[in-house]
Amino acid sequence: MWFLILFLALFLGGIDAAPPVQSRIIGGFNCEKNSQPWHVAVYRFARYQCGGVLLDANWVLTAAHCYNDKYQVWLGKNNRFEDEPSAQHQLISKAIPHPGFNMSLLNKDHTPHPEDDYSNDLMLVRLKKPAEITDVVKPIDLPTEEPTVGSRCLASGWGSTTPTEEFEYSHDLQCVYLELLSNEVCAKAHTEKVTDTMLCAGEMDGGKDTCVGDSGGPLICDGVLQGITSWGPTPCALPNVPGIYTKLIEYRSWIKDVMANNP
C-alpha cells in the first residue's frame, strides 16, 4: 500500500491514539538545530499534517494531496512540542493546488488502482502576512537545472523512526540521506505510474526512507531543492522500493506564475 493512501485513510478516518497524519523519517538522525530553516510544518487545526517548503516571505510549497480546509503553519521549528521563541506561527489566506493534480483521488470512497496517476502533486499556500526572514526562517530557491542521477539528497521531516504503522513519532526534526535514482528503477519497483514529473530517491538496501506525513517536505540534492515528498510504499524503507518525489524543475514556471499573479 502506498503511504499516500495510508495518509488519506488516516486523514479522513482518524486514529484515536494519534493525529491523523504524521511525518516519518526512517533510518535518519536529528537534524542539526536550525539547519533546515526553509522547512515548514503544515497543520490542520492543531494537528500536524504535512511538511512544506518556504519559497519566499509569502509562499509555502507543499504536496497537493495535503489539501485541507483549515490550515495553519509553523516556520522555524525544530521540536514540534517545545516552545521555541524564534519560531513563527502563521495563518493561510489561500491554497492553490496544481490544476493538473487529480483531486478526485483524495475522495474517501476512491478505490486505489494501478492506473491512478499522482502526477502534479504540488500546491502553493499563501501566508496571511509575510514571514519575518531571520537566521532560523529562510526561503530556499527553486531549481534552475535538472538533478543528476546519483546525487546525494537530504530529506527531512518529523515523526516515526520505525518503518511500521505504529506511529512512534519523533519530537525533533529528522534528516536522512538518500540517493537520487533513475526513474526506471522506481518504475520497476512500483506497479503504479511513475512519470517524467517525478523523481525517484531512496536506499536500495532498504532502511532509509521518507514516509507518511513527510509529504510536501523538501528533497535537497547536492545543496539544491529538487523535489518534495509525494508517495511511496508502506511499510516504509523496504529494500529495492524507493520513494517518489515531485520533480520541481518541471513546475518552475507554474510556481513563478502563481506567485506573481496572486500578490
Swiss-Prot record:
The keyword Hydrolase applies. Disulfide bonds join 31-175, 50-66, 153-221, 186-200, 211-236. Glycans are attached at residue 102. Keywords: Disulfide bond, Glycoprotein, Hydrolase, Protease, Serine protease, Signal, Zymogen. The keyword Glycoprotein applies. InterPro entries: Peptidase_S1_PA, Peptidase_S1_PA_chymotrypsin, Peptidase_S1A, Trypsin_dom, TRYPSIN_HIS, TRYPSIN_SER. The active site is at 65 (charge relay system), 121 (charge relay system), 215 (charge relay system). It is an enzyme of class 3 (hydrolase). Residues 25-260 form the Peptidase S1 domain. Residues 1-18 form the signal peptide. CDD domains: Tryp_SPc. It catalyses: Preferential cleavage of Arg-|-Xaa bonds in small molecule substrates. Highly selective action to release kallidin (lysyl-bradykinin) from kininogen involves hydrolysis of Met-|-Xaa or Leu-|-Xaa. GO terms for molecular function: serine-type endopeptidase activity. One of its GO terms (biological process) is zymogen activation. It holds the Pfam family Trypsin. Residues 19-24 form a propeptide. GO terms for cellular component: secretory granule. Its EC number is 3.4.21.35. Belongs to the peptidase S1 family. Kallikrein subfamily. Glandular kallikreins cleave Met-Lys and Arg-Ser bonds in kininogen to release Lys-bradykinin. This is Renal glandular kallikrein. It comes from Mastomys natalensis (African soft-furred rat).
